[in-house]
Amino acid sequence: MDGAQSFSLNIHWFRNDLRLLDNPALCNTVQLSSAHDDGILLPIFIFDNSRVYGSNVKSKLSSSRKCGPRRAQFILEAVADLRQNLERCGSGLIVKVGKPETILGEIAQQMDITSSYVNIVCQEEICSEELFINEAVSSHLTSQGIKFKLHSISGSTLYDPNTLLPFDRGVDNIPDTFSPFRKEVEKHCKIAVPLDAPINDQSKLPHNTRNILKEIGCSLDDDYMPTLADLGYNTEDIESVSTVDPRSAMPKGYRGGETFALSRVKEYIWDKDLIQTYFDTRNDMVGANYSTKFAPWLACGCISPRYIARECARYEELRGVKSKSTYWIVFELLVRDYFRFFAMKHGDAIFFPSGTIRKKRHWDTNPILCQAWKDGMTGYPLIDANMRELAATGFMSNRGRQNVCSFLALELNLDWRLGAEYFEEMLLDYDVSSNWLNWQNGAGVSLCTGGRINRFNIVKQSKTYDKCGEFLRLWCPELQNVPDESIHTPWLMSEAEMNECGMVLGQDYPSPIVDIGAVVESSSSSSRGRPKKEGKNKGRATSSNDLPTMKSLPIGSYQFDQK
């Protein structure tokens, strides 16, 4: 480049906010860029293949990868969709693979900035690994003599953590249990109206990204879109996600991206009125429509929780219906908020083996037991079916997650972090705070539950939520001919009964890898094993009314700002 260019550079660094609609960070970047006649808005997404993506990027404790190929593919799709949406606005998206600190530094240097500083705007991150990346960016740019300001903008929750009115010191003062938090927030706080897409009108976009890059002679290839191989995934990983399992509970033809996220919300709430029955069907396990399936798009920011909550409120208003179902969807978004705020308050304690309650306990790390759990070969059909579904599709129902967590931590006595890391690798909807705190809750080491141990009655759960074994047979086809009365406990069948249904225990289907006698004892008169002591809550109850907070809640108790 010959000579420095005079302009204001404002980089929007997309992270877990892969959308235009209701994106506070993007709105902030547009405002900064629009404040100067020579302002440039430069959108970029960086695949960090040194810390997140690739077959060889592993978790700290286990051999689980930080991001499995299925979620990586979903994010690739989301980034491609984001680029298309930006291009429709006259903009574009630069996509790079590498360390964010290196790439952001190179961009600033190639553009030869003469303005006072570069604005780098991104959505706020709260956990240590993500914050470390922020620090790496700041350190590297400073070492290169680049003047910059890194803006981290909150935008992934229903409520802004900086304006939690009932709590004097914001997230640092929130209760360590959910119910009092929920009551205060619903009483005193309002959900902000979702923001419009800030660049849905070309006149609001300061510059066309491609034209500016061409004018200043920047050598960035802004049409580049990496493949899984480019991100460091091996052939086996790539082949494993090349097809969609027909048994998948995800909506047919689902893809990553804001376009598909908005389509799913429209389908679930408006086109099919599935929202009407959500409260009653949310604990099912077969099919695409028993639950919203919004979570994968929420996790990578293809849609905002405020948008979903607003659609629920609009549904109540336009259809004249206020029900447990519409409320419960917003309630679960509030739980998601709480986990994020809780993680902000307690920091790295959400990753400690002793949990946020700092309860020391000897955890096993038996690799054979852990692998049997991962492979869905434990001998307990409910556990095996759920684990096989996760491996094949990247999805598992909420009911399934609770049971497999309880089984790993409380029956196998394996370090709960092994499970959390495996979920981090496999889940399409992996969210740091939600994943790790749900695992802490299940292992009984979380302040959220007061350290209470809720041991799930695996067999009873199986009989309650999959009475006829439809889900079990779907994912454990070797049990296809086992009768309904034995499908939940195949190890209790006699040899003659096994011969009759063509199944040999230990050969066609594994024998139980551990004796959870108390579970069997309370579910069958022909059980074996000595009962174990449990609290009054044996797995958070098993009826559809297992959430006592509903008793005291007015329907539609969430509030929106009218601005």
Identify the residue ranges that each predicted region occupies.
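Generic recognition of cysteine residues
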Residues: C27, C67, C89, C122, ...
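Active-site-proximal binding-pocket segments
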Residues: G287-E478, D484
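Soluble or luminal CAZymes and related metallo-dependent hydrolases
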Residues: F74, A78, G257, T378, ...
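Charge-dense, low-complexity intrinsically disordered segments
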Residues: R65-P69, Q73, K252-R255, T259, ...
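Trp/Phe/Arg-rich N-terminal binding region typifying the photolyase-homology
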Residues: M1-P206, R388-E389, S434, N438, ...
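Alpha-helical packing segments of well-folded alpha/beta enzyme cores
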Residues: A25, A78, L82, P100, ...
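Glycine/tryptophan-enriched, flexible segments
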Residues: I146, G170-I357, Y465-D466, E470-K563
